[in-house]
Amino acid sequence: MADSERSEAFGTPDDTPLSSNDAAELEQLRREAAVLREQLESAVGPQGTARSARDVHQLEARIDSLAARNSKLMETLKEARQQLLALREEVDRLGQPPSGYGVLLSTHDDDTVDVFTSGRKMRLTCSPNIEISLLRKGQTVRLNEALTVVEAGTFESVGEISTLREVLADGHRALVVGHADEERIVWLAEPLVAEDLPDGFPDALNDDTKPRKLRPGDSLLVDTKAGYAFERIPKAEVEDLVLEEVPDVSYEDIGGLTRQIEQIRDAVELPFLHKELYREYALRPPKGVLLYGPPGCGKTLIAKAVANSLAKKMAEVRGDDSREAKSYFLNIKGPELLNKFVGETERHIRLIFQRAREKASEGTPVIVFFDEMDSIFRTRGTGVSSDVETTVVPQLLSEIDGVEGLENVIVIGASNREDMIDPAILRPGRLDVKIKIERPDAEAAQDIYSKYLTETLPVHADDLAEFEGERPACIKAMIEKVVDRMYAEIDDNRFLEVTYANGDKEVMYFKDFNSGAMIQNVVDRAKKNAIKSVLETGQPGLRIQHLLDSIVDEFAENEDLPNTTNPDDWARISGKKGERIVYIRTLVTGKSSSASRAIDTESNLGQYL
């Protein structure tokens, strides 16, 4: 072993502190190694007495063993030193005084800042590690024991909720109202006033969407002591009731309602697209449209298509790209608009129309759609357990009248009990246009089926073979056969026998209660049967028999639906108007005559009869 290697093996690093015992042990090892070196040199040197080769090997092995022990001891000492340093850092950390937090109020050119902390407003210095230019008003900062700003945090995420009354002229302050109707002026934190944030700002404060403009009625997260509003809190109850969307439904997706679509286009699109002509003829555009008719016949679908078509038409008029056409469809969930607290329903209605006005002020068409309109705007005075309609209806009337001088907004209502809606809403000047969405006849049913049974669907090889592989001819024949079966006045299609108050009787078939939703359900059943057939037989494709079987199943599911307790009320909802019905008897095969029930007294007819 060379001298350098020996010194490295038995040496100690300069920066390693050793105890007295460790030093003594190392010194003993050095002396012993020196003696061994002398013995080795005397054994192999030119003047020494020759010794046996075995003694030389023993001495070398002894030296290697001592070197290994010394190296292991050095590693142990290094690990112990590292542990001592880590413990010392932990002790120093635990012994540090507590840090305080405050809200940044403002910054100054001399690298000082105003901070609100512990109920006081103080001017403090900043650590050199803090970039003053990145600090933002309302931000939380950490202070050391000397009240020096040492760290910048995010904005406060908890606090009191206050309602915004208005934003003041400077744009940085706002008037808010607390829970006890206490008004106060607060500063708006940076996220509420800045449209973009600089690079290097904390990621928690960056958002892909720029903050929208604050509007009266917004809920704000406020620290009343510091006098700052940090965040706009979405109103869950209003967000749930109003769905802002750009509908992707077009008129081409709707079948069997050509005449009704033409009516609503005349009522809605013409005033928007040809405003100059309307002004020239001094013609006031309609404020609203009522779509009424039986359930499942496409009222909501038409309303969505109106918003989609209107956006594209206005984009064409302006010369914009129709693919980037923008419109808003505010879909109001009628029954959920009702609230047990006095004044809440009216407040929701005000907020809905306020949002519509804001969207329309940007030049974008806005459709405010009230589904199930009869549930919230029924005739005043008809309530049994509640008189909420006495205030809700006037609120809607005032909002509709307020739309008079506002462009790009139209109200569309949908109901299957238009007779229950308050007459003041339906009068000319409010919901001017009334369009009845009727049940589809055989011709309309073929049009609806063609929307669902397209040439892209897989068709069974046997059915295609009947038409020499002509897929369009096969699909057309399928539609004709299924419509003939659905609209045939045969015994299997007999549904009800109704008795009117004057004693007349009438037999009703399933076709009298058909709807677009039922047709879609028939097609969906057939497609499911085709999938099951593929799994069972391995032969893919839709067959006419799948459609015919689906009609039978659909009719069977509907045989128990007629309400025999209040037959006239049920008939009105189903779209049957005219003479009052007092008796219903089901005619479906296998049904017992006990399923029918006569209504003889006026007291049992319900509140609408």
UniProtKB/Swiss-Prot annotation:
Coiled coil (UniProt feature): 19-96
Keyword terms, alphabetized: ATP-binding, Chaperone, Coiled coil, Nucleotide-binding, Proteasome
GO molecular function: ATP binding; ATP hydrolysis activity
Xref: Gene3D superfamilies: 1.10.8.60, 1.20.5.170, Nucleic acid-binding proteins (2.40.50.140), P-loop containing nucleotide triphosphate hydrolases (3.40.50.300)
Positions of ATP binding: G296, C297, G298, K299, T300, L301
Record-linked Pfam families: AAA (PF00004), Prot_ATP_ID_OB_C (PF16450), Prot_ATP_ID_OB_N (PF17758)
Region of interest: Docks into pockets in the proteasome alpha-ring: 608-609
Pathway of action: Protein degradation; proteasomal Pup-dependent pathway
GO CC entries: proteasome complex
Region called Disordered, residue ranges: 1-25
GO terms (BP aspect): modification-dependent protein catabolic process; proteasomal protein catabolic process
Family: Belongs to the AAA ATPase family.
Xref: NCBIfam families: pup_AAA
Entry text on domains: Consists of three main regions, an N-terminal coiled-coil domain that binds to protein Pup and functions as a docking station, an interdomain involved in ARC hexamerization, and a C-terminal ATPase domain of the AAA type.
Functional note: ATPase which is responsible for recognizing, binding, unfolding and translocation of pupylated proteins into the bacterial 20S proteasome core particle. May be essential for opening the gate of the 20S proteasome via an interaction with its C-terminus, thereby allowing substrate entry and access to the site of proteolysis. Thus, the C-termini of the proteasomal ATPase may function like a 'key in a lock' to induce gate opening and therefore regulate proteolysis.
PANTHER family membership: AAA-FAMILY ATPASE, PROTEASOME-ASSOCIATED ATPASE
Known partners and oligomeric status: Homohexamer. Assembles into a hexameric ring structure that caps the 20S proteasome core. Strongly interacts with the prokaryotic ubiquitin-like protein Pup through a hydrophobic interface; the interacting region of ARC lies in its N-terminal coiled-coil domain. There is one Pup binding site per ARC hexamer ring. Upon ATP-binding, the C-terminus of ARC interacts with the alpha-rings of the proteasome core, possibly by binding to the intersubunit pockets.
Protein known as: Proteasome-associated ATPase
